[in-house]
Regions:
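Soluble C-terminal extramembrane regulatory/interaction domains of multi-pass membrane proteins
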Residues: 41, 46-50, 61
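Conserved RecA-like P-loop NTPase helicase motor core
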Residues: 51-219
Length: 219
């Protein structure tokens, strides 16, 4: 499930940072490959221009809680004698629960879970990719992100830790070839991106490139 993938990604973030630092200190250029950016797990909680006091992984569990109120129903369109059926996603409103429960028991249970999630501290980042990038940048390295993410979480102070205060910021559209050139010619020290990021470009060490440091792939 998306939440399990998010958890595994968040757990591995610190390990990936240390692995990248080791390669950089050895004189290599790390290329970090990821399966997904997990952007949707936080864009449902925060929009560009907003601040998040605590970028805690546990907050993505709020998405799971909200998903419990979603269900699929059959709808139909009729054209002449032909009837076409299709699925539509609908959402229960909290008020709808009163149709099934005679008291506020369900509402109290929901509020309890929300409070529990908001107070949970796992010390894991809500956006592992942002924690990785900004942790390395804080060490003085230049990192390029080759993904299609539109919103990033900018840490107010990365030194505070993985779950510090962040601000949601719109990300500029990247020029894939330009970023590859910057990596190959020494402007960037590290690349992180989806597994298909290198399609159509060369990230290998070559005499044609200024930066001759050995490339190391970390997955």
């Amino acid at each position: 499930t998306p939440t399990i993938r998010q958890l595994l990604f968040s757990i591995k973030a610190e390990e990936a940072i240390q692995a990248a630092l080791e390669q950089l200190k050895a004189g290599h250029k790390p290329i970090i490959q990821i399966n997904r950016t997990m952007e949707s797990n936080y864009t449902s909680l925060i929009q560009p221009g907003m601040a998040m006091p605590k970028a805690e992984f546990a907050l993505c569990l709020l998405n799971c809680l909200k998903d419990m109120f979603k269900y699929k129903a059959l709808a139909a369109t009729k054209k002449g004698k032909a009837v076409k059926y299709y699925e539509v996603e609908q959402t229960f409103d909290m008020k709808d629960l009163k149709k099934f429960f005679n008291n506020d028991e369900a509402k109290k249970a929901y509020d309890f879970l929300v409070k529990k999630i908001n107070s949970t501290d796992t010390s894991l980042p809500l956006s592992p990719i942002d924690y990785f990038v900004q942790s390395l940048e804080n060490k003085g390295y230049k990192v390029g992100e080759m993904t299609q993410r539109k919103t990033i979480l900018k840490y107010e102070n990365i030194k505070v830790g993985a779950t510090g205060k962040t601000h949601a910021v719109m990300r500029k559209k990247i020029d894939k070839k330009r970023m590859a050139s910057d990596f190959n010619n020494g402007v960037l020290d590290v690349l992180i991106g989806n597994r298909v990021m290198s399609s159509g470009i060369s990230l290998h060490c070559s005499d044609a490139f200024t930066d001759q440091r050995k490339r190391t792939v970390i997955t």
